[in-house]
């Protein structure tokens, strides 16, 4: 709330005050201008420029790399625009561009309309002016001619008779009538002009509509001609014809398979051996999954070939191949036909009109089929890490066949039991190191489906179980870092997250932070309500399902659980989340599922595993589709004995092979290197033990793997890893991988004022920058990895510009000893923390401390405005004590009070200083400040003047004189400073504006 009020109060003074501030810059030199300072101005400016140059030189490494890559990117965009090449943009960039274009368009339209209206007004004015002048000239000419005619006709009479004088009232009435007539004429002209413009606009719109219609008709004609041509060639097929063709093919296949029909081409000639005919394809290419399936079935049928007579062998095999091809064709076209049948609501009369559209749809379907076949080819061409099971006819659909393991992260507050819960899940089915058990990978634990089946067996009586995925991959390191590192172009590679909440404490600060992070990434998650064993008198049943355990608890335990659960449900609702216990949740998409668990007894863990699989399999099958395209993220950079610097990578899609050329993000630019070794630890061994690693020639997603390669020292944790393919351009991939980092520069303040931010990984740096942006804290420079002396030197440039920002915010990084000493020597504050909000608290406390010191230093110059009325003079002198009422503003202890009088002879303004407020009393009770309306009976004020030259009551000052606080240019500037700005109310700023006139302040 304090932040909000601060923000609102920043605009309390008007432009006039800002102009004042511009004249006397900041209060940093408030006390008295030092004559030496002006003399040494050149020296300071030289020093400042030198420090700026130093900052640029220091910038080195990370920041300069980012700037270079951003410049390169901008240059590339300009070149592409010049060449006229299509520019690939992200969805966000497109939306931003669209909005900007719309804004610009609206601005241009408004400007055009305004200009037209202005021009029309000017034109009308000119026309009216001309008409009035013309009318006046004609009238004057008519009067003149009439006068001259009259004079020539009766010269003697006119000489004798003087002209009759017109009464003043009549003349005024005539003038009014003339003016009215002129106005009517002007209005008439304006109306005519408006009507003309409206008519022109209508005509223009009608013409545009006509042109559109003509263009549409021409396009239709063109399409019709094209359709006729295709029809003449016999290439055009309607939906109905396509369906008929497919139906005929299926019937033919059915007839052949029945064996009642003999086809001449299939009959064997005399003397021909009973060998199965080899299937010859028109193009030599790699086999698709359907062909492999047919091969498998062929091999099965071969086993039973002894029973089948020789003369039927060839026929049966050929028919089988035919049948499988048709089945594959039917499967491929199934989606298309379903869509077609849904859309074909139009009658037969409209068939001819829709033929062109049908043809296009048919072509699109063919392209999709080819693309699908290509994906299958690529997937098959790379051999699998584990032997795949032989597909059965029922599992021929691709969406169930190629699902990969879902990737899961664990988040939550400190000490909620994240690590313990993970250990419990990991330890559940380790059966004496047997094969097929849970395997510990680099940075992740892999649970094969057999282990999950064994663990979730207790759920069978409550829920229906399906197991379509090969397993579950759980990221080992719990917390924000691992989650925020698993990202790809803003969207998370983590498929599902577990948010752990302590049932005893509810939502805590870091839990709320985790919810925000999950919301930003749009990641689905479930809530694990941990520590249910802490409920008083809970009877534990190890590794049981929650529902079974809960049903066996006493009534008191059930009631306590219900009350605590309701409280947490309410807290989640405050964060904008609807939640429900997972087995009572009827709408999984709108309500967050809550699973009560115990990391100690293992109760609720089967429920959690079942829910994770249920959600990922049913709702995320598209995201879990296995693709051959490599998607990998660097989790950590580590030094390993015997391998040098290695990177821990989560491979979420595709294959990685030994010898692959990889591109990744580095501190000093992109790193291009070859994979020397792909390593995973020995099964069921702790990573901390120096065990032998298992070498692999290739690995398949999804898993965690350690990569050993050259030049990995400067690799950035949290960045993407790309593989250079045979058709890829290495330079393009290098630019592409650095694009992730260039976005960080948008968070850096362009004014050059702000704090220096250092983080351990890319994900945590992004999270910290977002947090600082929300808190309105400017950032001058960013960095990754440990803090060294050169990083502290960047922050030292702030000592002159803005001392309150001479701070380093370090998130989860080590600080070098030399850097610490240098920071202490220069007076730079380094804050290091593992939790973002701890950093923020430390920084705000430090800023508040600095402001408090500043307030003490400039308290004498901070004079708050007030207007007083004298009620009673208690003591005239030594000390002067008077009773006053506060008419406006705030009266504080230490405020100098004066009266302003005008000299009757010289008419000059005189300021009579009564003294400084020493103490204030209301009803004999001392107070520090009194505001307007705070007291009705007045306040007793004791005034003392150090000079001893106080004015005398009755002679210099009387009770009718208004008293003011003695404000000056310096006091106004002091109140504008950050240290006092929050304490000055809006009414006080308005009063200051009035007092500036009273005291004649420029």
From Swiss-Prot:
Keywords: Cytoplasm, GTP-binding, Hydrolase, Initiation factor, Magnesium, Metal-binding, Nucleotide-binding, Phosphoprotein, Potassium, Protein biosynthesis, Sodium. Residues 530-533 are annotated as: G4. It is found in: Cytoplasm. Residues 13-23, 307-342, 352-370 have a biased composition (Acidic residues). Residues 412-419 are annotated as: G1. Its main location: cytoplasm. Residues 598-600 are annotated as: G5. Plays a role in translation initiation. Translational GTPase that catalyzes the joining of the 40S and 60S subunits to form the 80S initiation complex with the initiator methionine-tRNA in the P-site base paired to the start codon. GTP binding and hydrolysis induces conformational changes in the enzyme that renders it active for productive interactions with the ribosome. The release of the enzyme after formation of the initiation complex is a prerequisite to form elongation-competent ribosomes. Stimulates 20S pre-rRNA cleavage to mature 18S rRNA by PIN-domain endonuclease NOB1. Belongs to the TRAFAC class translation factor GTPase superfamily. Classic translation factor GTPase family. IF-2 subfamily. This is Eukaryotic translation initiation factor 5B. It comes from Saccharomyces cerevisiae (strain ATCC 204508 / S288c).
């Amino acid at each position: 709330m304090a932040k909000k009020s601060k923000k609102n109060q920043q605009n309390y003074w008007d432009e006039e005050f800002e102009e004042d501030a511009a004249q006397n810059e900041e209060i940093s030199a408030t006390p008295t201008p030092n004559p030496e300072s002006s003399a040494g101005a050149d020296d300071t400016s030289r020093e400042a420029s030198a420090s700026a140059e130093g900052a640029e030189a220091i910038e080195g490494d990370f920041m300069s790399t980012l700037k270079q890559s951003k410049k390169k990117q901008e240059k590339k965009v300009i070149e592409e625009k010049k060449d006229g090449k299509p520019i690939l943009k992200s969805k966000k960039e497109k939306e931003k561009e669209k909005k900007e274009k719309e804004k610009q368009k609206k601005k241009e339209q408004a400007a055009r309309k305004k200009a037209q209206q202005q021009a029309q007004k000017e034109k009308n004015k000119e026309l009216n002016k001309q008409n009035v002048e013309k009318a006046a000239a004609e009238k004057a000419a008519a009067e003149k001619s009439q006068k001259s005619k009259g004079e020539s006709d009766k010269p003697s009479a006119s000489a004798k008779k003087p002209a009759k004088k017109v009464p003043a009232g009549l003349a005024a009435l005539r003038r009014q009538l003339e003016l009215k007539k002129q106005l009517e004429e002007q209005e008439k002209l304006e109306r005519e002009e408006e009507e003309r413009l409206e008519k022109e606009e209508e005509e223009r719109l009608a013409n545009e509509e006509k042109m559109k219609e003509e263009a549409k008709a021409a396009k239709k004609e063109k399409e019709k001609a094209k359709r006729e041509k295709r029809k003449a060639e016999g290439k055009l097929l309607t939906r109905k014809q396509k369906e008929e063709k497919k139906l005929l093919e299926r019937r033919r296949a059915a007839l052949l398979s029945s064996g009642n029909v003999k086809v001449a081409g299939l009959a064997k000639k005399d003397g021909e051996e009973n060998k199965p005919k080899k299937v010859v394809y028109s193009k030599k290419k790699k086999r698709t999954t359907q062909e492999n399936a047919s091969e498998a079935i062929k091999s099965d049928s071969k086993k039973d070939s002894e029973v089948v007579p020789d003369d039927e062998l060839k026929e049966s095999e050929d028919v089988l191949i035919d049948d499988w091809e048709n089945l594959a064709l039917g499967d491929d076209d199934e989606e298309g036909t379903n869509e077609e049948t849904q859309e074909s609501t139009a009658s037969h009369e409209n068939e001819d009109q829709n033929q062109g559209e049908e043809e296009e749809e048919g072509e699109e379907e063919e392209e999709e089929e080819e693309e699908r076949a290509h994906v299958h080819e690529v997937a098959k061409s790379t051999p699998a890490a584990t032997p795949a099971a032989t597909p059965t006819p029922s599992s021929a659909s691709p969406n169930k066949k190629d699902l990969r393991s879902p990737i899961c992260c664990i988040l939550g507050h400190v000490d909620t039991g994240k690590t313990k819960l993970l250990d419990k899940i990991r330890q559940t089915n380790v059966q004496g190191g047997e094969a097929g058990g849970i395997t510990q990978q680099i940075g992740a634990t892999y649970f094969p489906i057999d282990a999950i089946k064994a663990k979730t067996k207790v759920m069978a009586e409550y829920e229906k179980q399906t197991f379509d995925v090969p397993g579950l991959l759980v990221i080992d390191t719990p917390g924000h870092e691992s989650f925020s590192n698993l990202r790809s172009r803003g969207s998370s590679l983590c498929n599902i997250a577990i948010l752990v909440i302590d049932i005893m404490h509810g939502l805590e600060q870091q839990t709320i932070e985790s919810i925000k992070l999950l919301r930003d990434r749009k990641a689905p998650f479930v809530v694990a309500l941990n520590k249910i064993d802490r409920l008083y008198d809970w009877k534990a049943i190890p590794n049981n399902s929650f529902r079974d355990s809960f049903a066996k608890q006493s009534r008191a335990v059930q009631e306590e659980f219900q009350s605590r659960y309701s409280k947490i449900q309410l807290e989640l609702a405050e964060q904008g989340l609807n939640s429900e216990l997972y087995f009572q949740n009827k709408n999984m998409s709108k309500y967050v599922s809550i699973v009560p668990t115990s990391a100690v007894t293992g109760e609720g863990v089967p429920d959690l595993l079942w829910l994770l699989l249920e959600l990922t399999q049913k709702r995320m099958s598209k995201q879990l589709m296995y693709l051959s395209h490599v998607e990998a993220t660097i989790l950590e950079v580590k030094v390993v004995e015997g391998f040098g610097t290695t990177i821990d990578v989560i491979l979420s899609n595709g294959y990685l092979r030994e010898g692959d050329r990889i591109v990744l993000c580095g501190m000093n630019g992109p790193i291009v290197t070859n994979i020397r070794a792909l390593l995973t630890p020995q099964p069921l061994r702790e990573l901390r033990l120096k065990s032998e690693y298992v070498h692999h020639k290739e690995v398949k997603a999804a898993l965690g793997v350690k990569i050993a390669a050259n030049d990995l020292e400067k690799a950035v944790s949290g960045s993407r890893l790309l593989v250079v393919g045979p058709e890829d351009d290495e330079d393009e991939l290098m630019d592409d991988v650095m694009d992730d980092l260039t976005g960080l520069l948008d968070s850096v303040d362009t004014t050059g004022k702000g704090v220096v931010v250092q983080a351990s990984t890319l994900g945590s740096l992004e999270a910290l920058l977002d947090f600082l942006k929300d808190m309105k804290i400017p950032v001058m420079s960013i960095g990754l990895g440990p803090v060294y002396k050169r990083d502290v030197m960047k922050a030292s440039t702030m000592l002159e510009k803005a001392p309150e920002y001479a701070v380093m915010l370090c998130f989860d990084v080590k600080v070098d000893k030399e850097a610490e000493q240098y920071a202490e020597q220069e007076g730079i504050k380094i804050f290091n923390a593992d939790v973002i909000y701890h950093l923020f608290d430390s920084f705000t406390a430090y800023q508040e401390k600095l402001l408090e010191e500043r307030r003490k230093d400039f308290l004498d110059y901070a004079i708050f405005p007030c207007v007083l009325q004298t009620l009673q003079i208690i003591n005239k002198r030594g000390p002067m004590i008077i009773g006053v009422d506060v008419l406006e503003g705030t009266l504080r202890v230490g405020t100098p009070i004066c009266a302003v009088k005008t000299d009757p002879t010289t008419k000059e303004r005189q300021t009579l200083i009564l003294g400084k407020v020493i103490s204030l009393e209301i009803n004999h009770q001392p107070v520090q400040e009194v505001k307007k309306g705070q007291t009705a009976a007045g306040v007793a004020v004791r005034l003392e003047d150090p000079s001893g030259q106080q004015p005398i009551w009755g002679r210099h000052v009387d009770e009718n004189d208004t008293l003011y606080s003695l404000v000056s240019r310096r006091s106004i500037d002091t109140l504008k400073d950050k240290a006092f700005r929050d304490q000055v109310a809006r009414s006080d700023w308005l009063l200051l504006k009035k007092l500036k006139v009273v005291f004649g302040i420029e």
